[in-house]
């Protein structure tokens, strides 16, 4: 039996997760397709992006404060992941990773989140750990009225937070427009022991507008504008806070869908500005004076702004070659300019002021990356499918000044103005329907990644987790991964299950290595480390998702995730979370909804002491939520109440820097009016 290429796209189960937040569908890996799944990911109307991603398969969060947590996927983080917004490349402007790309997005302006694991993420660029693509919300063309709007307000007692959400839109003829905005303000929260955690406050604004024009039934032209600004953001686990972090995104997209082919083209620009600030911290240090043998009192403050601008474009085309094959091609390019500065003001008490010391912690650099991605999907039968894809990226780094050369000359580096690297990837995916409810998948793959700007050109970057200064290495090799991933899926009307396991063998693994020759800069460091390629490492991960509905209105949802990592030196990989389990039980009856959640994690005793890790204890917390829907002729009012951390447990997770307790019991109240 032959299967057309059009049917391929409907029948085949891609090796990625797509969680659609508005359309209420979860793709491929586990096609749950019901509202309870959306409710599992979005625990309330004002769920932050951190709260949402923490509920995704394989995702953990590195926490430095109560805002802007850094996502980790199956043990991979930072430059090992592709994190994009509607396919657009974007990068944080903070050398301390205080502004991951996810921090500039709100769930209210998201349409869906797509996950791809391991090396099979070449559609978004060569990488080894996977990809997270956050698709921006589109105008609501399913509304019964040409004009629609919604207003939500809410508060959380643990941090006295204030949340306001507004969304509106208008459709007429061939034009569609949507607008949504969020305001959040949170005071320092209290942990489970009743202690207020200083420097855990934040305030932010986010607004997104989209316009779409439909010239005919097969074409669409869309424009997006997004602006996000956060102020007074505290980071209790770090020696500095953030006075201002803002981002702007502009995009123009054209899409055409025909029976035998589809084409999408996009051009975009985004800009990020980030300012670290220690003006509210205790900046008095006591330093031993080797000359006098006495202890000097030193007041030190630092100004640390960072800038990151990205211009990019891509074209994607998908063609039906014949009844069994569909070909997808993508050509893309982005140009990223980055610069991070530090001005250090030092004052030895009782002595004249010293002149400020200036350096560039990221030199003024422009990175230009051009890539080509090709993929073919073949249907051998209505039960067996194979996808083969490959990608090549060419990266050119161009230093814009001699500052980096002067700084690195101290370490006997003579830097050229230009560096180039070529990376490649190739991946296979086999999908076999053993029977109608059973699906088996197998994915072998290989990929490489280019070193990040921090790993390549970082200059005296202090890491508060292990207490070391870090310096980049301009001559790092590309990091490489050989991956194997298997999955088993089962689905019927009442019960659905997805089990996946992956194994990654890494070579030329990049990490900071102690260097006793180069002195550290900061008074309070344990020493200095230089980024180097180490021979190798291994990462194993297992994820289990299931949902069960024994009767109408009653739903059980479970997510279990586990990661194991080890260096070739037989030491544990640092920052690997222990086994974690999430369970949700919900019940719906007419306008009422009730839900109780449990989040538990085991003790993590596989730690790397050299990198500042300590054993983290196990924990288990419960959350409760209820809501009632008031229905009117043309509108609806939702009233939602909940208690998070029901038993006021004092706990922290293994990836939480500084072992600072998370929020204690909180009573939450939310109202949402939709017209």
Language model region names:
Residues 11-13, 23, 45-53, 69-72, ...:
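N-terminal periplasmic accessory domains that precede
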Residues 323, 380-382, 386, 394-395, ...:
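Gram-negative outer-membrane beta-barrel transporters
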Residues 229-231, 271-275, 339, 344, ...:
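Surface-exposed extracellular loop regions of Gram-negative outer-membrane beta-barrel proteins
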Residues 108-112, 121-193, 200-206:
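Outer-membrane beta-barrel translocator/receptor signature
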Residues 238-258, 306, 361-367, 414-433, ...:
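Outer-membrane beta-barrel signature, preferentially recognizing the C-terminal barrel domain
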Residues 159-185, 195-231, 242-260, 317-323, ...:
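Transmembrane beta-barrel wall of Gram-negative outer-membrane proteins
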Residues 89-118:
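Short acidic/polar hinge/loop motifs at secondary-structure boundaries
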Residues 7, 186-187, 194, 198-200, ...:
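Flexible loop and strand-edge segments within Gram-negative outer membrane beta-barrel domains
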């Amino acid at each position: 039996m032959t299967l057309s290429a059009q049917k391929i796209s409907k029948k085949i189960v891609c090796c990625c997760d797509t969680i659609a937040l508005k359309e209420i569908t979860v793709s491929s890996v586990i096609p749950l397709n019901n509202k309870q799944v959306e409710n599992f990911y979005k625990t309330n109307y004002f769920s932050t992006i951190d709260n949402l991603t923490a509920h995704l398969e394989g995702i953990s969060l590195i926490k430095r404060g109560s805002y802007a947590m850094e996502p980790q996927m199956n043990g991979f983080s930072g430059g090992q992941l592709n994190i994009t917004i509607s396919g657009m490349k974007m990068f944080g402007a903070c050398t301390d990773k205080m502004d991951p790309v996810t921090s500039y997005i709100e769930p209210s302006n998201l349409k869906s989140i797509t996950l791809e694991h391991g090396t099979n993420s070449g559609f978004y660029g060569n990488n080894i750990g996977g990809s997270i693509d956050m698709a921006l919300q589109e105008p609501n063309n399913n509304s019964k009225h040409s004009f629609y709007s919604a207003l939500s307000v809410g508060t959380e007692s643990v941090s006295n937070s204030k949340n306001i959400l507004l969304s509106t839109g208008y459709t007429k003829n061939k034009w569609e427009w949507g607008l949504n905005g969020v305001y959040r303000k949170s005071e320092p929260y209290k942990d489970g022991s009743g202690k207020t955690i200083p420097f855990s406050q934040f305030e932010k604004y986010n607004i997104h507008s989209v316009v779409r024009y439909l010239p005919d039934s097969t074409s669409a032209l869309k424009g997006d504008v997004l602006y996000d600004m956060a102020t007074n953001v505290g980071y209790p686990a770090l020696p500095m806070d953030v006075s201002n972090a803002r981002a702007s995104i502009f995009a123009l997209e054209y899409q055409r869908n025909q029976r035998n082919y589809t084409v999408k083209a996009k051009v975009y620009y985004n800009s990020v500005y980030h300012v670290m600030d220690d003006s509210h911290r205790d900046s008095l240090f006591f330093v031993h004076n080797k000359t006098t043998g006495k202890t000097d009192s030193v007041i030190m403050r630092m100004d640390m702004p960072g800038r990151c601008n990205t211009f990019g474009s891509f074209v994607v085309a998908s063609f039906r070659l014949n009844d069994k094959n569909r070909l997808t091609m993508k050509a893309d390019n982005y140009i990223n300019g980055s610069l991070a500065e530090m001005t250090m003001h030092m004052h030895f008490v009782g002595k004249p002021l010293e002149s400020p010391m200036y350096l560039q912690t990221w030199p003024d650099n422009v990175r230009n990356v051009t890539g080509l991605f090709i993929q073919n999907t073949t249907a051998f039968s209505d039960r067996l499918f194979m996808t083969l894809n490959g990608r090549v990226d060419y990266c050119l780094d161009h230093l814009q000044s001699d500052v980096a050369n002067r700084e690195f000359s101290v370490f006997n580096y003579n830097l050229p103005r230009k560096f180039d690297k070529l990376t490649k990837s190739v991946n296979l995916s086999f999908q076999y329907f053993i029977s109608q409810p059973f699906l088996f998948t197998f994915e072998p793959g290989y990929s490489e990644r280019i070193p990040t700007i921090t790993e390549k050109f970082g200059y005296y970057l202090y890491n508060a987790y292990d207490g070391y200064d870090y310096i980049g290495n301009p001559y790092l090799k590309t990091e490489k991964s050989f991956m194997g991933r298997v999955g088993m899926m089962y689905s019927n009307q009442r019960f659905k299950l997805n089990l996946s396991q992956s194994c990654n063998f890494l070579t030329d693994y990049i990490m900071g290595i102690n260097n006793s020759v180069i002195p550290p800069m900061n008074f309070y460091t344990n020493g200095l480390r230089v980024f180097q390629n180490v021979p190798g490492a291994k990462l194993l991960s297992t994820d289990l998702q299931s949902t069960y509905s024994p009767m109408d209105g009653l739903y059980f949802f479970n997510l279990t995730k586990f990661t194991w990592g080890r260096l070739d030196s037989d030491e544990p990989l640092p920052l690997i979370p222990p086994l974690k389990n999430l369970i949700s039980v919900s019940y719906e009856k007419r306008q009422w909804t009730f839900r109780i959640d449990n989040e538990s994690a085991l003790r993590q005793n596989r730690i790397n002491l050299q990198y500042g890790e300590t054993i983290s204890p196990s924990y288990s917390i419960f959350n409760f939520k209820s809501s009632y829907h008031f229905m009117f002729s043309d509108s609806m009012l939702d009233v939602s109440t909940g208690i998070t951390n029901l038993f006021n447990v004092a706990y922290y997770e293994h990836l939480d820097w500084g072992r600072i307790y998370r929020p204690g019991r909180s009573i939450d109240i939310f109202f949402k009016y939709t017209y």
